[in-house]
Amino acid sequence: MDAAALAEKWREVVDNPYLRDFPFKLELNEDGKVEFAMSPATNRHSLLQGKLQALLLRCLPHGVQMPECSILTSKGVKVADVVWASDTFFERYRDATPYPKAPELCIEVASPSNTTDELTQKTRLYLEAGAVEVWIVYGDGVVEVYGPEGRRAQSLFGIAVTPLEV
């Protein structure tokens, strides 16, 4: 399925009243099929999302931080738990759903059910879609930072990220 068809399919999913009340994220694979992205969210997962948004707001006051951001990737529409987008990115794509390109920083909060392969694939997909950096955040507050070259010792955004207080 091409990018335009995937984006249209995603908008149909978002607008479908029968799919609105699931307690977990939905994503689309590259064939436009709905996938359940994770097990139902725990309160710890939500707490980490909130702490990450607060951290981004404090450390990167310019730009926009948001939860649950849909991004068109080569493997379908994926939903990052938290993202930060520059003002330039946001002005360009503001209300697009899904975003046709990844915001500069994409963050995944790992769930106990996530496999290493799933997290590695999402990291790769966000970077291929244009993210400058991807963070994987574990339940204990440990943060792994990745760029196109692989794992980084620290964030290029100048944020001391590990470990997060939870």
Language-model features and meaning:
Residues M1-V166:
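Gly/Pro/Ser/Thr-rich low-complexity, intrinsically disordered segments predominantly at protein N-termini
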